[in-house]
Amino acid sequence: MMREAAELTGVVLYAQPVGEYDRRLVILTRERGKITAFARGARRPKSPFIAVTNPFVFARFSLYEGRDSYTLAHAEAADYMTELASKMPGVLYGYYFLELASYFGREGLEAAESVNLLYAALRALIRGQMSPELVRRVYELRSLMINGEYALPESGAGMDGCAWYAVRHTVASPVSKLFSFTLSEEAERSYTAEVSSAFRRTVDKTFKSLAVIDKMR
């Protein structure tokens, strides 16, 4: 009896070559969190998996489940994020977002809001209406909140008024409306300080892509 494929929607976080023609993928999915999948023959010149097995691709994946990983049977891309490649330094921030999504991602736990947040953050980098650094801080703070690592303070004491409003907006707004504000230089400094402080208290990992961004400043 033929196994039924699992239908999962998500974003490709990592893709690395395996053997002569295959690719190993890490995908953050709405339904089952972070998974590992193998795309057989994905590196062959005429493979239907060539384009859909790259980082940033948002797609619907049909996968056969094994003991420790999945095997890709079919994929239908909704967004290849091709515009991001020409955005500098936006693409570097994009890779950082993928790293952070992988850090927080857990296998077997639904991650619909995390997938939606990642997709919205990547699209915000492409639109370019917010600075990549502000997009980063919004993404970081909302990620902390989703994962139960940030509680909104009772007041914004010591914080710029606009920054305090931005913090509340980041925590409470629908993902579709998150990346829709700008701040003055002073307010952004205050907002960044709050997010950075909360982030350092929780996350103890060094992110390679973030180190590259810091070197470019």
Predicted feature descriptions by range:
Residues 1-23, 28-217:
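Non-catalytic alpha-helical scaffolds and adjoining flexible linkers that form interface surfaces
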